[in-house]
């Protein structure tokens, strides 16, 4: 008995453009017995069916690729959260410390 049976194809819409004519999708499927991860733009054809475009990437799902992708996503999320925390709690100090003296240009202030 299998405790978990993976679907034959995984698909998730990651983003949609403003006029709903393009999507970015994360898709995992098998091709010739090997699993692949795709991050690809999709468009609607004349019959309003979503079709994959040539814009995107596909990579084999193996331990090294999956680990590298996971590490990259964790780093991106960590950096975004760190920046948000710094801006929220220290924007006044940052803005004060980086104001130029005796110059005509100004460093943009961080808004919270």
Question: What kind of region is each of these model predictions?
Answer:
Residues 12-15, 28, 43-44, 104, ...:
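Sequence-pattern detector for short linear motifs
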């Amino acid at each position: 008995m299998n405790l978990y049976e993976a679907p034959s194809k995984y698909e998730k819409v990651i983003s949609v453009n403003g006029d709903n004519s393009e999507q970015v999708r994360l898709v995992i499927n098998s091709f010739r017995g090997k699993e692949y991860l795709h991050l690809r733009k999709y468009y609607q054809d004349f019959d309003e069916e979503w079709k994959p475009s040539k814009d995107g990437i596909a990579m084999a799902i193996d331990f090294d690729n999956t680990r590298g992708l996971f590490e990259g996503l964790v780093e991106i999320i960590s950096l975004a959260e760190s920046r948000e925390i710094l801006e929220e709690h220290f924007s006044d100090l940052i803005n004060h410390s980086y104001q130029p003296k005796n110059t005509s240009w100004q460093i943009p202030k961080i808004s919270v």
